[in-house]
């Protein structure tokens, strides 16, 4: 899993602290240096690491820690609390519209696994009693519509498509279709690009303006490390995203992207893809990482 390497390194720092009994400021300073290295090696952004270590150090050298009977436990607790806070504290839930259908716009770069993961998310919510509709707004990638129809069929979720038309018109027509057919949740599978470009962002802004989605979720591959943060910031600047879905968290990614995204964009990670299968998705719980 993405956080395993980081957990191992932090545990070895904690083990060293536990073996000491009383702690001095110097002990904490050394431990913080190791924590800093572990986070940087896990691909957490430098600015995030710097702020994190400063926060933990400030709390850890207080009298309540140094004079406590279990100073090591206090330091470990502070590190864990600050890590959880960094990723957003509690699980951030989806926002549902007061008047259905709730429109969820899925955005991201090509190759992030957007089409598969939009279907995974629709499947998860269907299991929770929702009636989702998938709308094919990616008219550029030749196989995108077929791919969405295939995963829709596998999950028994309807797919609305109009071929290679105008994505804004397709999105609007998809929502009308949902109203007529009793779908209370609409997922717009939008086009990705290999890299961020103006044409893509303009198209996505036009879709957003036309349908006013309740959620704009950015799908990001956890394996791309530091690039994930730049991607998240670019999409957030253009679209004011409401949250992030991290995919491939089951891989050997270093996990730093997850720690950096929330801290730098202020937007929560809402869901995590944890495997290849269509049911391998779950709400992201920072406190369980």
Region spans (language model):
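Conserved residues at beta->alpha junctions
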Residues: 108, 136-139, 191, 219-222, ...
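Primarily NTPase-proximal linker/entry elements flanking Walker-type ATP/GTP-binding cores
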Residues: 6-137, 144-164, 170-190
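Short, small-residue-enriched loops and turns at beta-alpha junctions
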Residues: 112, 140-142, 167-168, 192-196, ...
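Conserved phosphate-handling catalytic cores of large alpha/beta enzymes
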Residues: 172-175, 183, 195, 201-209, ...
């Amino acid at each position: 899993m993405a956080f395993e390497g980081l957990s191992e390194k932090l545990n070895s720092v904690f083990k060293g602290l536990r073996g000491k009994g009383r702690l001095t400021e110097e002990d904490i300073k050394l431990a913080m240096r190791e924590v800093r290295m572990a986070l940087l090696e896990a691909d957490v952004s430098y600015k995030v690491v710097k702020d994190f270590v400063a926060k933990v150090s400030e709390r850890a050298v207080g009298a309540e820690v140094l004079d406590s009977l279990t100073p090591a436990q206090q330091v470990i607790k502070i590190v864990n609390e600050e890590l959880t806070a960094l990723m957003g504290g509690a699980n951030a839930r989806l926002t549902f519209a007061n008047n259905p259908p709730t429109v969820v716009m899925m955005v991201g770069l090509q190759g992030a696994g957007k089409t598969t993961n939009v279907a995974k998310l629709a499947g998860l919510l269907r299991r929770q009693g929702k009636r989702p509709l998938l709308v094919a707004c990616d008219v550029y990638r030749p196989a995108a519509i077929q791919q969405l129809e295939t995963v829709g069929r596998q999950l028994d979720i309807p797919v609305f498509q109009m071929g290679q038309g105008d994505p804004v018109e397709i999105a609007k027509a998809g929502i009308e279709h949902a109203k007529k057919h009793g779908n209370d949740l609409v997922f717009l599978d939008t086009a990705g690009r290999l890299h961020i470009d103006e044409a893509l962002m303009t198209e996505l802004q036009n879709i957003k303006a036309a349908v006013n989605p309740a959620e704009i979720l950015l799908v990001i591959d956890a394996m791309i490390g530091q690039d994930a943060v730049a991607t998240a910031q670019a999409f957030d600047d253009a679209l004011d995203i409401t949250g992030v879905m991290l995919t491939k968290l089951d891989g050997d990614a270093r996990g730093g992207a997850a720690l950096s995204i929330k801290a730098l964009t202020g937007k929560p990670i809402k869901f995590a893809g944890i495997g290849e299968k269509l049911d391998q998705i779950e709400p992201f719980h920072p406190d369980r990482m």
